[in-house]
C-alpha cells in the first residue's frame, strides 16, 4: 500500500469500472477526505465538494458558489474565474450547487494547466476575498439599484429558473416531501427570499460549511498523485486544523398522503394545462442495489409511451403526457410521476389511476423481457458513460455524494457487482416485490392550476482590477500540434457506401440517408417521423416489444435529422435522415436486424398509428412550450440563423418556432389519417431511393461481419440516387420578439460573416472582456457571450432581466473593444483558450459522430491545422481592426428575443413583429 506523508490511507482497491485503482485517504491535520482515481485517462480531473445544507430559501450556498470564484488572497483580481475561462485549456471548468452539496470540478489534458487550476480553485474556496468584500455579495447575490429594484446575478438567474411552471411545481413538491429538512428549501434561492439574506449571515454560513473537514477532494486520471497530494498538504490542508463537529443532514419523517394545491400565475390560463405530481420515497441512499433496482424498474415500466405502466395511464386519457423523475443522489431518494396537460377533474383522478395500474401489473407480474431489457440498457450506459461531462468530473461529483451520505467516497464508483446481483434476481420476483413496496404508501401530491394573476401578485478589501497572475501561465507553445483523426476507409456495398473508422470498445453503427432531393416542406414531416417511431408497431412486434428488443440488444438507438455544412465558401448543406446505433460487438447481427425493422417496417397508417400521432404531437407541443421558457436563447439563435444560410433555415424548420407552428397546425387539423399517409410516402421515397452511407466505428472483425450482414438486410438496395446538396430558399431578415411566461429575457443579435477561424479569438475577447462585465456583472444576466458559427456570428444573453438595455450594450461593444490595448500576455491567453477548444477530449460516441461529420463535410487534418495556425497568428492590430469593423456589421444584424410581456412591450420599437407563444 502506497504511503503519502500527511495522510492516512484507509484502503486501496481495484476498480474495473474506472479502468484503474481507487485509494481513499484522510488528511491527518485537517480531516479532509481524499479519493484518488488512478487510470490512463489523460483528461485529468479535480473536484472539491462541501456538504452544504440550506436552512432557508435565500440561496446562500448558490451565492457562495458564485462568490468564492470572484477573487482570493493569492489571486486578488475581480474575476479570476473569467480569466481562467478565457485562457485555460480546460475541457471542463465550472462549479455546481446541489440541494445538499456544492462541488467545484475541472478537467484538463494539460499538466501545467491542471496545477494552475487546482491552486486557483483551492485558494478560491478556502481563502475567498468575498468574506471581506461585501461588493461581491451584492453583485453575485442581491442589491438594490438606484430606483429601488432588486438585482444580482443569482437573484436574476433564479427569476428565470423559477419562472417555469415545472420549477414551481418541483419546489412545492420538495417542500411537501421534506417540510423539516434541508431538502424542503430552494437551494438555488427563491427571489422572494434572497433579499432577506444579510452579508453577516452569508459570512457565518461560509465559515461553518467551507472547512477542510467538511470536504471531499478527488484527483482523477494519469498524473503524479504524490506530487498533487504534497501540494494540497503544504499549501492548504496542513494549515487548516479540524473545526468543530461538521454539519450533518437529518432524515425526514415520511409524509405519505400530503397534498398541496398550487397556483401558477399566467396571463393566459388554460383549463387543460393543469399539472399533477405524485411522489414516493424509495428507501435508503446507502442501499445502492435497491436504488439501481428502482432505476431499472422505472425504465421497464415507464420509459416510453408503450411501456406497460405508462401505456395504462395514458389509456385513461387523464392528460397529454406523463413524465418520470428519479433522484437517488440525496439522503432520501425519491421518485416522481408528473401528469401534464390535464384538467382539474382529471388530475384528481391521477393517484387512483396509478394505484389501479400498479395493482394490475402486480396481478400479472412484470414481464421478464422488459426487466432484462431495462437492466441491459442501464448497464450499457454505466459502461459507456454517455453525455458531455468528462469521466473525472462525474467521478468527483459521485465521490462527494457517496462521502456525504455514507462516509465512503468510492461507493458510487462501483457498479459491476450491483448489476450482477440484480441480474440474478430477475427470476426471483424481487422486482415485483420492489414495485409493491414503492407504490403501497399514499403518494405526496401537488396539484398545479394555471391562474390569472391578481394585482398584488405582479411582481473594502485588498483587490485589484489587474490580471490573474499564475505561477506557470500557459502560452501558445503549450498547445501542441493537435491529434490527427483516425484514418477511415470507404467502399461500396449493397447499394450503399460503407465507411469504417477503427476503434475499440463499444461499436457505433450509423446509417445516413441523403435528403438532398427532399422538398423543404417535407423536412418537417421527416423530423416528426423520428419523434414518433418509438410509438409505432411493426407487423412482427408491438411498439412495446420492439422497444424491449432495442433495449435488450442495443446500448442506444435513435433516429434523427442531421444538418451539416462544409467550411469552404459556398459549401453545400448536407441533410441526412440518420439511424444511430451503439452496441457491443457480439450484438452486431441483432443490431442490423432490429434497426432495419424499426426504420423500415413500422406501420404508419391505421388506427394505432393515428392514436400515437395525436398523443405524441400533443406531448411535443407541451415540451417545446417548456423549453421556450428554459432555453429561449437557443430558440432565438436558431430563428436568427434561419435568415442567413440553408442549414440554419432547415434547422429552424425542424427544431424552432416554425416546428412549433407545424405541431400546432397538426393538432388543429387533427387529420391523423392524412398525416400517416404523408409520413409513409416520404419515408418510402427516402429509404428506397436516397443515397445511403453506413458508418461503422469498430474493429476489423466487426467490419468483416458487417460486410456479410448488410447485403442480406433491409438496408440493401440495387440502386440509389446519388447524394446531392440540400437547398431551401431563405427569407429576408426580420427583427422578432416572442413573448413567453416568466420574468427574464433571452436576447440575440446575429449577422452573416464569412468563416475565418481568427474571429473565434475576437469572440472570446468579446465574451470575457466586455460582455461578461457589462451584461452579467453590471446588468445581472446569468449568461452572455459571442459565438462564431460557419457563416454567421451572434451575441446573446441568457436569463437576462433586461432587453432594450442589453441591445444597447451590444451596440457599444465594438468601440469598447477597439479602444482597448492588448498586451502580448493578453494575446497568449486569448489564443490558448480559443485554440484549446479545438482539441477538447470527446467521449467515444461523440468522437464517432464527429468523424462522420468531417467525412461528409470534407474536413481534413490539414484544414484543422490551418485553423490552429491562423488562430496563433492573431495580433493586437487584427483584434482592434476586427472590433472596429463590427460596428457597421451589428447595425445591419437581426434581433430576435424571447422575453416577458412587459420587457417586449417596452422595447417593441426594436422589432418588426411580436408574437405571443
Identify the function of each model-found stretch.
Residues 1-45:
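Non-catalytic terminal extensions that flank enzyme cores
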Residues 427-454:
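Extended, domain-scale alpha-helical bundle/helix-rich regions
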Residues 200-235, 651, 655-656, 675-710, ...:
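Non-catalytic, conformational "gating/processing" segments within enzyme and secreted inhibitor domains
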Residues 92, 203-207, 264-266, 309, ...:
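Generic recognition of flexible, low-complexity loop/linker segments
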Residues 37-40, 47-49, 155, 159, ...:
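His/Glu-based metal-binding/catalytic segments typifying zinc-dependent metallopeptidases
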Residues 58-70, 523, 527-531:
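Active-site recognition of the HExxH zinc-binding catalytic motif
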Residues 43-53, 79-127, 134-140, 167-192, ...:
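M16 family metallopeptidases and their MPP-like homologs
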Residues 144-212, 218-221, 225-233, 240-265, ...:
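Hydrophobic, small-residue-rich alpha-helical packing segments that form membrane-like cores
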Amino acid at each position: 500500500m502506497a504511503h503519502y506523508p500527511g495522510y492516512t490511507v484507509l484502503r486501496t482497491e481495484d476498480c474495473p469500472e474506472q479502468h484503474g485503482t481507487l485509494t481513499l485517504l484522510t488528511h491527518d491535520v485537517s480531516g479532509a477526505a481524499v479519493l484518488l482515481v488512478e487510470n490512463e485517462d489523460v483528461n485529468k480531473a479535480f473536484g472539491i465538494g462541501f456538504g452544504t445544507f440550506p436552512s432557508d430559501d435565500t440561496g446562500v450556498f448558490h451565492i457562495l458558489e458564485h462568490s468564492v470564484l470572484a477573487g482570493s488572497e493569492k489571486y486578488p483580481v475581480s474575476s479570476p474565474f473569467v480569466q481562467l475561462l478565457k485562457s485555460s485549456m480546460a475541457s471542463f471548468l465550472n462549479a455546481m450547487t446541489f440541494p445538499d452539496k456544492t462541488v467545484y470540478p475541472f478537467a484538463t489534458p494539460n499538466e501545467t494547466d491542471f496545477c494552475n487550476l487546482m491552486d486557483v480553485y483551492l485558494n478560491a474556496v478556502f481563502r475567498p476575498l468575498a468574506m471581506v468584500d461585501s461588493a461581491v455579495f451584492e453583485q453575485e447575490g442581491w442589491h438594490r439599484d438606484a430606483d429601488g429594484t432588486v438585482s444580482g446575478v443569482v437573484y436574476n438567474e433564479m427569476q428565470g429558473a423559477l419562472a417555469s411552471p415545472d420549477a414551481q411545481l418541483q419546489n412545492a413538491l420538495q417542500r411537501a416531501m421534506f417540510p423539516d429538512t434541508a431538502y424542503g428549501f430552494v437551494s438555488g434561492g427563491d427571489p422572494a427570499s434572497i433579499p432577506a439574506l444579510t452579508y453577516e449571515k452569508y459570512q457565518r454560513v461560509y465559515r461553518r460549511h467551507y472547512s477542510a473537514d467538511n470536504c471531499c477532494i478527488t484527483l482523477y486520471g494519469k498524473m503524479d498523485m504524490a506530487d498533487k497530494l504534497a501540494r494540497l498538504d503544504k499549501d492548504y490542508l496542513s494549515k487548516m486544523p479540524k473545526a468543530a463537529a461538521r454539519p450533518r443532514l437529518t432524515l425526514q419523517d415520511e409524509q405519505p398522503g400530503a397534498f398541496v394545491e398550487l397556483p401558477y400565475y399566467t396571463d393566459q390560463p388554460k383549463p387543460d394545462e393543469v399539472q399533477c405530481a405524485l411522489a414516493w420515497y424509495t428507501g435508503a441512499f446507502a442501499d445502492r442495489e435497491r436504488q439501481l433496482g428502482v432505476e431499472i424498474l422505472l425504465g421497464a415500466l415507464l420509459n416510453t409511451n408503450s411501456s406497460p405502466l405508462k401505456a395504462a395511464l395514458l389509456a385513461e386519457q387523464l392528460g397529454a403526457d406523463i413524465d418520470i423523475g428519479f433522484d437517488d443522489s440525496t439522503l432520501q431518494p425519491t421518485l416522481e410521476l408528473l401528469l401534464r396537460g390535464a384538467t382539474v377533474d382529471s388530475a384528481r383522478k391521477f393517484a387512483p389511476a396509478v394505484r389501479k395500474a400498479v395493482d394490475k401489473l402486480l396481478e400479472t407480474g412484470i414481464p421478464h423481457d422488459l426487466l432484462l431489457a431495462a437492466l441491459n440498457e442501464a448497464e450499457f450506459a454505466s459502461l459507456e458513460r454517455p453525455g458531455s461531462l468528462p469521466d473525472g468530473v462525474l467521478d468527483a461529483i459521485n465521490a462527494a455524494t457517496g462521502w456525504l451520505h455514507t462516509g465512503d467516497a468510492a461507493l458510487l464508483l462501483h457498479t459491476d457487482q450491483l448489476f450482477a446481483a440484480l441480474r440474478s434476481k430477475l427470476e426471483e420476483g424481487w422486482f415485483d416485490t420492489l414495485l409493491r413496496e414503492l407504490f403501497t404508501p399514499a403518494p405526496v401530491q401537488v396539484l398545479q392550476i394555471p391562474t390569472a394573476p391578481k394585482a398584488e401578485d405582479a411582481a473594502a478589501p485588498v483587490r485589484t482590477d489587474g490580471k490573474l497572475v499564475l505561477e506557470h501561465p500557459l502560452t501558445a507553445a503549450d498547445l501542441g500540434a493537435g491529434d490527427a483523426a483516425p484514418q477511415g476507409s470507404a467502399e461500396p456495398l449493397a447499394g450503399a457506401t460503407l465507411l469504417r473508422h477503427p476503434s475499440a470498445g463499444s461499436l457505433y453503427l450509423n446509417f445516413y440517408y441523403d435528403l438532398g432531393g427532399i422538398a423543404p416542406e417535407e423536412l418537417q414531416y421527416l423530423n416528426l417521423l423520428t419523434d414518433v417511431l418509438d410509438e409505432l408497431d411493426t407487423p412482427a412486434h408491438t411498439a412495446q416489444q420492439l422497444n424491449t428488443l432495442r433495449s435488450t440488444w442495443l446500448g442506444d438507438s435513435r433516429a434523427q435529422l442531421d444538418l451539416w455544412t462544409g467550411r469552404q465558401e459556398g459549401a453545400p448543406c448536407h441533410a441526412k435522415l440518420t439511424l444511430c446505433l451503439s452496441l457491443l460487438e457480439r450484438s452486431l447481427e441483432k443490431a442490423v436486424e432490429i434497426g432495419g425493422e424499426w426504420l423500415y417496417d413500422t406501420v404508419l397508417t391505421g388506427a394505432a398509428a393515428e392514436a400515437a400521432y395525436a398523443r405524441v404531437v400533443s406531448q411535443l407541443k407541451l415540451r417545446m412550450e417548456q423549453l421556450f421558457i428554459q432555453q429561449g436563447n437557443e430558440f432565438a439563435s436558431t430563428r436568427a440563423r434561419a435568415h442567413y444560410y440553408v442549414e440554419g433555415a432547415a434547422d429552424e424548420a425542424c427544431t424552432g418556432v416554425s416546428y412549433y407552428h407545424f405541431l400546432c397546425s397538426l393538432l388543429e387539423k387533427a387529420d391523423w389519417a392524412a398525416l400517416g399517409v404523408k409520413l409513409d410516402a416520404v419515408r418510402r421515397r427516402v429509404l428506397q431511393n436516397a443515397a445511403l452511407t453506413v458508418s461503422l466505428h469498430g474493429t476489423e472483425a466487426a467490419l468483416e461481419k458487417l460486410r456479410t450482414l448488410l447485403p442480406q438486410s433491409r438496408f440493401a438496395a440495387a440502386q440509389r440516387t446519388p447524394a446531392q446538396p440540400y437547398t431551401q430558399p431563405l427569407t429576408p431578415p426580420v427583427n422578432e420578439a416572442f413573448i413567453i411566461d416568466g420574468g427574464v429575457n433571452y436576447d440575440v443579435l446575429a449577422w452573416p460573416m464569412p468563416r475565418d477561424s481568427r474571429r473565434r479569438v475576437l469572440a472570446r475577447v468579446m465574451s470575457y472582456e466586455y460582455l461578461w462585465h457589462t451584461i452579467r456583472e453590471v446588468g445581472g444576466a446569468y449568461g452572455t457571450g459571442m459565438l462564431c458559427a460557419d457563416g454567421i456570428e451572434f451575441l446573446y444573453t441568457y436569463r437576462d432581466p433586461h432587453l432594450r438595455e442589453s441591445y444597447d450594450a451590444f451596440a457599444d461593444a465594438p468601440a469598447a473593444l477597439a479602444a482597448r490595448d492588448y498586451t502580448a500576455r493578453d494575446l497568449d491567453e486569448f489564443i490558448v483558450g480559443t485554440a484549446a477548444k479545438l482539441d477538447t477530449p470527446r467521449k467515444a460516441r461523440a468522437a464517432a459522430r464527429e468523424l462522420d461529420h468531417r467525412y461528409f463535410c470534407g474536413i481534413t487534418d490539414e484544414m484543422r491545422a490551418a485553423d490552429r495556425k491562423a488562430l496563433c497568428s492573431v495580433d493586437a492590430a487584427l483584434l482592434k481592426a476586427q472590433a472596429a469593423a463590427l460596428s457597421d456589421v451589428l447595425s445591419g444584424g437581426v434581433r430576435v428575443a424571447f422575453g416577458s410581456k412587459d420587457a417586449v412591450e417596452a422595447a417593441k420599437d426594436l422589432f418588426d413583429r411580436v408574437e405571443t407563444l
